[in-house]
Swiss-Prot record:
InterPro entries: PsdUridine_synth_cat_dom_sf, PsdUridine_synth_RluA-like_CS, PsdUridine_synth_RsuA/RluA, RluA_PseudoU_synthase, S4_RNA-bd, S4_RNA-bd_sf. Belongs to the pseudouridine synthase RluA family. Coiled coil: none annotated. Residues 11-70 form the S4 RNA-binding domain. This is Ribosomal large subunit pseudouridine synthase C. GO terms for molecular function: 23S rRNA pseudouridine(955/2504/2580) synthase activity; RNA binding. It comes from the Bacteria. SMART domains: S4. Responsible for synthesis of pseudouridine from uracil at positions 955, 2504 and 2580 in 23S ribosomal RNA. The active site is at D140. Keywords: Isomerase, RNA-binding, rRNA processing. PROSITE patterns: PSI_RLU, S4. The gene is rluC. Its EC number is 5.4.99.24.
């Protein structure tokens, strides 16, 4: 059997094969390559070989490909309802490459322990209906605002690379409890995430953490020691803005993880909103500048 690679994005041979045949294990692929039961362009290949569009992967007849039997996917009414909202009520932008939604606070981006409903589970329903949506980045469950979703594999690779190469600029608006130590500036720390624990700030020279940089600007004073602050993350570490806000002496209002429980008044919501995203022209050939409307509860403060 000959498989002609049809993806314009270069990919490792082993990863390409496992996308086509999810039941293939890494060990089986490498053994088949050693025995020349799988070759590329009539030559012996390594698992790390990057295949591109037009390459021919030959799989010997003696090699038994593990084919997964199709299973019937079952979706809950909540997942189907959420899927409809993603393509209507939450949708704020769509082109050939991406959609952008205004994710409400309280909705998880991905599933996990004790999470039964998420954007990802709704996308799986849409994909079962013929779409090919792929998550590329995430927002915390408590954070509202702009979430970009790729419409196909090629777009997902381009978008993933864009985040990595800093071709995506994100701006967040937050209501903080307390005023930042300066009206504007830069926060630069390391953030360490250990398995089973929440992220924490560490010294900039700590080799265990990863560099985290955030620009911030005080926009206005509100009331009752509340302030509107703009945050621009240069890096994308887990809980980065929440940790940096706390470090600045102004935890995000409603943040029950990093806020000051003894001083900060109770709030049902965490007031952190992904307000604006700008995609460089280099990503899809045109600049995309998107803005997500603030949730109504922001108006109450």
């Amino acid at each position: 059997m000959i498989i002609t690679v049809n993806s314009p994005i270069a990919s490792r041979l082993d990863k390409y094969l496992r996308r086509l045949y999810p039941l293939l294990t890494q060990g089986v692929i490498e053994k088949a390559l050693r025995q020349k039961q799988i070759i590329v362009n009539s030559k012996k290949a390594e698992a790390s070989l990057r295949v591109v569009e037009g390459d021919e992967i030959f799989i010997h007849d003696k090699f038994n490909l593990p084919i997964a039997q199709p299973t019937k996917l079952v979706f809950t009414d909540a997942e189907i309802t959420l899927a409809k909202k993603i393509t209507t009520e939450y949708l704020i932008y769509e082109d050939d490459n991406i959609i952008a939604i205004n994710k409400p606070a309280g909705l998880a981006t991905q599933g996990g322990s004790k999470i039964n409903l998420s954007v990802d589970s709704a996308l799986k329903y849409l994909n079962s209906q013929g779409a090919d949506f792929k998550l590329v980045h995430r927002l915390d469950k408590e954070t509202s605002g702009l979430l970009l979703i790729a419409k196909n594999y090629v777009s997902s690779v381009k978008l993933h690379d864009a985040f990595k190469e800093k071709l995506v600029e994100k701006t967040y608006l937050a209501v903080t409890y307390g005023k930042p130590i300066k009206d504007q500036g830069e926060v630069k720390t390391n953030i360490e995430k250990s398995k089973g624990s929440i992220p924490k700030i560490t010294d900039i020279n700590d080799n265990n953490g990863k560099l985290a940089i955030t620009y911030y600007k005080l926009l206005k004073s509100l009331t009752n020691n509340l302030f509107l602050v703009e945050f621009i993350p240069i890096t994308g570490r887990m809980h980065q803005l929440r940790l940096h806000a706390k470090l600045l002496g102004c935890p995000i209002f409603g943040d029950n993880k990093y806020g000051n429980d003894k001083l900060m008044p109770y709030s049902k919501y965490m007031f952190l909103h992904a307000n604006n995203i700008v995609l460089s022209k280099k990503v899809f050939g045109k600049e995309v500048n998107l803005e997500a409307k603030l949730p109504s509860y922001f108006n109450r403060v």
